[in-house]
């Protein structure tokens, strides 16, 4: 769900999540991609 994704992207990502999603503290825009 997008709202869950926003909540997850609200806080700084851990190193694991950074590598997994290839992002830092930016929202993932898979919907746009």
UniProtKB/Swiss-Prot annotation:
It comes from Xenopus laevis. Gene3D superfamilies: 2.30.30.30. Pfam families: Ribosomal_L26. This is Large ribosomal subunit protein uL24. It comes from the Eukaryota. Keywords: Cytoplasm, Ribonucleoprotein, Ribosomal protein. One of its GO terms (biological process) is translation. GO terms for molecular function: structural constituent of ribosome. GO terms for cellular component: cytoplasm; large ribosomal subunit. It is found in: Cytoplasm. Component of the large ribosomal subunit. InterPro entries: Rib_uL2_dom2, Ribosomal_uL24_euk/arc, Translation_prot_SH3-like_sf. Component of the large ribosomal subunit. The ribosome is a large ribonucleoprotein complex responsible for the synthesis of proteins in the cell. Belongs to the universal ribosomal protein uL24 family.
């Amino acid at each position: 769900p997008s709202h869950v994704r926003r909540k997850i992207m609200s806080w700084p990502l851990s190193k694991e999540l950074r590598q997994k999603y290839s992002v830092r503290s930016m929202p993932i825009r898979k919907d746009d991609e």
